[in-house]
Amino acid sequence: MPLLRYIFLNFSFSLMHVYVYAQEMNEEIIVTGSLIEEVQTSNPIFSSSLEEINKRGTFRVEDYLNSLPLINPGNSALHSNFSSGTSSISIRGLGGDRSLILVDGKRLPSGSPLDGNAAQDLNQVPDVLINRIDILTGGKSTIYGSDAIGGVVNFVLDKNFIGTKISMHQGAYQHSNNSYLRNFNSNADSSVLDGINSKYSVVVGSKLNNNSHFIGYIDYKNIDSVRWDKRDIGACAFRGNSGCRLSSATYMSRIQNGSNGGYVSENGFSSSSAGFNFGAANFLQRPDKRMNSGFIYDVNLANKSKLTFSFYNLAQESNAQIGAPLLFRQKINIPCANPYITSAQFSNIGCVNTTDNINAVVSKRFVENSLNRSQFFQTSSNRGIIQYNGKTKSDWQYKIYHQNSHTSLKYKYLNDISLSKVKNALNIDSNGSCISNDLDCVAINLFTTSNNVANNVTNGITQEALDYIHLNLSIYGEISEKIFSGVIDREFKLENKLIDNYFILIGGERRENKLIKLPDSSFLNEDGAGQQVQHQNMYGKVSVNEAFLQLGLAFKNNLKIDSSVRFSDYSFGKDAFTYDLGFYYPINNIFSIKASHQKSIRVADIQELFEPEETELVYATDPCAGATPELNASQCLLTGLPNNLYQNVDDTSAQLYSKSSGNFNLSPEKAISNSISLIADLNRSRIEIDFYQINMEDQISQLSIATVIKNCVASESSNSYWCKLINRSNDGTLSTSGSYVSTPLFNLSNFDTSGLDFRLSHEIDTPIGQVLIKNITNFLIKKDFKQDADSDPINCKGFYRLGDEAGLCYQPSPKIQNVLDISLIK
């Protein structure tokens, strides 16, 4: 039985008044993978028309793309925890920052200033203007620059529309709760219909005179949330087929002083508690409000030249809910004079006299007032382009353009807990009065267990205490990009027996990227108790100057060869050279073959270069934790664990603290891509088989915690470089505030993937009409990830792996993916 079963219901309605006219404008031809209009790329390329996209009934662009076997999901509206509020895709599973998104051949800017990630935001694409989508796999850095390692997705817009189009779309998700993994259907609706989404759009196109054309559009989307607890697949966070992953931070306070203490109970402390289902309140689909608007204005000038002005705007609000606020293993000083410590708890927590203080490790899930933490994203993106293209009297074609992009983000993290105020609220005297100088301080009682808000402090946590420790945090960020680009190209005819003609293109480009991130004082002071990622002020600026050349040869026997090179000089002292070579040859009237070989790069993004030192919780395990540690006592001693704490380190979760920062010495990632395609064009059928191989080296990644500990043990010296990266807390853990493993950012990892794509298109006649069958299948042959040069390869094929060594295996890697489409076309 499948884990996920849903039906996407939609209703679309449009009114369209269209004028058809003879095309007189100098129409720009968009060729994906080539800057020369007459030269076709030799890479595997998959194109989807507007009709094919609409048939799927998908509401978002990323939903359609993620359904294709060529693409793995990236960030999307289905992410809440660690969300950036953006949507991205991952071609061949190489990550969103290695999959370049283009609109009419021009790159979109980076998506979010929150994390500085280079992955572009699909929400910026004006989907009401899409004419077709081209997906080119394999590297193409020679044509588009950095980031095109996995390939490119090019959205080609309909810029010649004339008339008025008004559209309305309504949709929802239906799901049947019948999973065998949890007895979920016994206490939930057997069928749910939710996640209602609405879309309203208007497109207006007009030929203003014989020499100009204008298109304007506005597109509004409203998407309702879907909570995980409304689905059997999300009733809890599954741990394989064995049960649920639960949090050790529960409604029962956990207060520990070394080996003393535990979960608060009526008779003192207990050693265990029912775990907290942290996933239930999370959003499976984030609520989202989005407005896209813009225009394209073309003017034909003298001498067959053309001037184009275009502007695109995105205004978006989205909310990522991630469960109740909490304290997680925070070190807090508690006076033994605290009047809410019971007599049974007093000695059990390690108190001897009321004048004593204990340095406790405190965990607590604040469920009393039913608030959940939320990440609120308010994004505004603007992209303006001015382009001038034409042709000289000597038949040289030219195109120059300037693109200016700006994205701003107002990020709010709501309903967190102030760590400093919790410390104040627990630092009280025997009368229950706050000792701190904070005049607003309200005492909090964590020594009495209750699910509900207490009417007075002796019975538990009061509303006044919850109001006092309540905390909202915020970040303001900006990303801007400027592109200056120009190319000239020409076709040359040759009169010889071998070559018919050749094409040459020469170009140059300059890109400037800038990022600003300004967290508020609560972020800067690390006051948010529920934060998994630390945020500091960040400012970074990177620019690149590039020169490139493309050649195309057309032979008299119909063989076509294309080649290109690009040199890139970056402002932080790094440079890169990329190349590609390919051919296309029609063997006969039916069969043809094409192949490509290229080197592509990805240069470190602004965060990877400029990020200040920050700490975050990552999925990892401590081999020295628990009653039966994986390592022996002498090995754990090397990692900083005293012998007296061996077998006494609390193993509470699969999350440890990692500390990292940017590295200005990072080199570009490099990938060698190869492909070969066999194509058969029959009478009513077309078959294409594509073999691909991508080998990536020098992947920018953090050292994993497991690698640091492994190398520390292998060094056999606690003073080695590796062992000094490990900083345990006084209780020996790596999951308590103040503890961490330094995991520097280096060019570490290698990635190797290969596979086969099989594409079929076939028309057949039936009694009810002509039917078109389209099928695309991906067979994954190999997908291996190496954390570093000395590590053994991790097999990703057919797996989804979690942990600090998972790397690019973090995404599911199906062995076979297939999409079948059957349409009645006549």
Protein language model regions, located:
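Gram-negative outer-membrane beta-barrel transporters
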Residues: D690-K826
